[in-house]
Amino acid sequence: MKSTKNCVRIYRIKQDLTFVNILIVSNVNSEVKMIYNNVLDAIGTTPIIKLSRMVDEDSARILVKFEGLNVGGSIKTRTAFNMILEAEKQGKINKDTIIVEPTSGNQGIGLALVGAVRGYRTIIVMPDSVSEERRKLVKHYGAEVMLIHDAGNIGECIEECLQTALRMQRENPNVFVPQQFENPANLAVQKNVTGKEILEAVDGPIDGFCSGIGTGGTITGIGEALKEKNPDITIWAVEPEDAAILSGGSIGTHIQMGIGDGLIPPILNQNIYSDICIVKDEEALQTAKDLASKEGIMCGISSGTNVAAAIKLAKKLGKGKTVVTVLPDTAERYFSTPLFED
């Protein structure tokens, strides 16, 4: 007679943005499957990966949370969904609502995705300096794209995108602008979900964290979650050299898309970080390329920015410590950029 064994498995069931651990005792020969009601229920639980070939022996270990494997290909799907979810709960939007948002890319893709699933018409207002792939992805989800010319100052262009969206809201009562730069639902999901995922996954104390700043939601939300667990953690903000507004630098145009929008976001907690690391375009590009060729991780340019800073932080903290950062998106939306030039 063939014997069987019971095994214990923990399955994580998604309910909106909260996971519930369910303990299941099952026969090893049985098969348990999870079925999501829609793609939004599959958001999150992205892997944390230890970098093996890009870190010196005398440095802290570097762990990266790879959001390129998230639904929609970026970390911004989390924030897009939570902003819309909260707006629905508060009665701010209905079936006739038109979602309009100014963005340099990934938030727009996330909102287009959420709009497709929830049935909202979505219009994304973007600088014309963002990659062609980002525009096409927004359109592919069924949303509309409005382009604003970037004349060499990304801050001024983002401001014009915002004013365009707000003007549309004044002219049409059905228009809802999520306002990612000041929406508390943005940082809430990063603190309560993304930050929690990191804390649950990492085996031991987290000594350092660094992140580029777009809306400020990632560094504020995750940073606050990590700091509550370890008040002595070292947190660095990261800026592109050509948009180092926190450092008092001049504002131009750069290729580290998704961060360095030339403004200080209202939701950014400027007390959460102790230092600012400035990264040049060339350094961000090379680091992103190294992540592919040395670690097998296909990620975007701002991922290179974050890891370039993480390498510096890891050297400062030294062996035996742990540094965490985020890889915000996937490389496939950068084919037309210098990331894929020889």
Predicted regions and their residues:
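Generic low-polarity alpha-helical segments
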Residues: 12, 20-21
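Intrinsic disorder/low-complexity segments in short proteins, especially the signal peptide
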Residues: 22-24, 28
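PLP-dependent amino-acid enzyme catalytic core
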Residues: 7, 11, 28-342
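Cationic, low-complexity basic patches in intrinsically disordered or flexible, solvent-exposed regions
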Residues: 3, 15
